[in-house]
Amino acid sequence: RVLEENSNVVASISNVKYFGPNLENIEKDDLFQKFKNIFKYRFDKPTKFKQVFPAYGLYGKKATLYLRMDRSTGLYAVFRKPIIRKSMIVHPFASSDLAIILNVLKHGDFHVIDEILMEKYIGGYSSKGIIQTLKFQNTSYLEIIFMSMPFTSWCAKNLGWKIFLKNFDWF
């Protein structure tokens, strides 16, 4: 309904609640679990932070918000079909899910319904960590070592230099 009534909104999603057997382990505060989470590039606790964010206004502001929050749950939104088609990444790389969201934001605003209408399972293959996921995808060791380079290069080319340099400390 939001997409029908607001032509500037290109995607809409509700807040998301996580569930699953791994949630308890990720939420633990013991030293071993903290080390394990860091090794898997898991720096936050899913139940403590919002996973989707409304983004309205100028592209630079929206891009900065999503870069800083570094969440890809927004991919589960309902999108305008022509916009999501234009926003897809042809050759995926680590963080290409975030790149898709950044592409979508170029075309308009991202609406979030302020209630939980969706639950997301926190498990499956990607819960083993980013390095294991990249190995599963037959990523070379060099690409794993420099896993952020393709995304950084993509941002330099696609965000525009002003937005890229403004957020340079994030990279």
For each predicted feature, which ranges?
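Conserved donor NDP-sugar-binding/catalytic core segment of glycosyltransferases
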Residues: 2-40
